[in-house]
Amino acid sequence: MTKEEKIKFFDDAAASRDARRARSRYYHRELLSFFHFVIPKNSSVLEIGSGTGGLLAELKSAKALGLDFSPAMTTAAKTAHPAFNFMIADIEALEITEKFDYVVMQDLLGNLDDIWLSFRNLSRVTTPETRVIITTYNPLWEPLVMLAGAAGLKGRDLRQNWLAIA
């Protein structure tokens, strides 16, 4: 799938994103609890792949920036959370150089074309003290996730790239 096709996929999903997340609220509530545990209030936080901005708004950070390569997701985030900053940006072609205490990549890795390039680009927004928090679901959940999708409890996702253990 090309980058343009991925952007279109997420642009098309932007309008229903929050309703879709509400259907899997247990998963997202657990993630939010984890993020509250590891990210102190008043930290500076960069969320890459911020979607409609719900997580960033919940973290109550002193400085927060959300990046997403989908213009429609970014517009939805700005509309829903006007007190926060959101930008259209791609981690694989990152241009910002502002440094953050925490960088969050929630359920993003599998959607990246070049994971290693993305990791290299993180050096532009991190210091040696920055904590990078990456979440992804365990592939052991795949049968249940597929069943939930077939039952209409989960929306369609892109095919994920997986990292090999070598």
Where are these regions (language model features)?
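A short glycine-rich, Lys/Arg-flanked "PGG" loop and its adjoining helix->strand segment in the class I
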Residues: 116-131
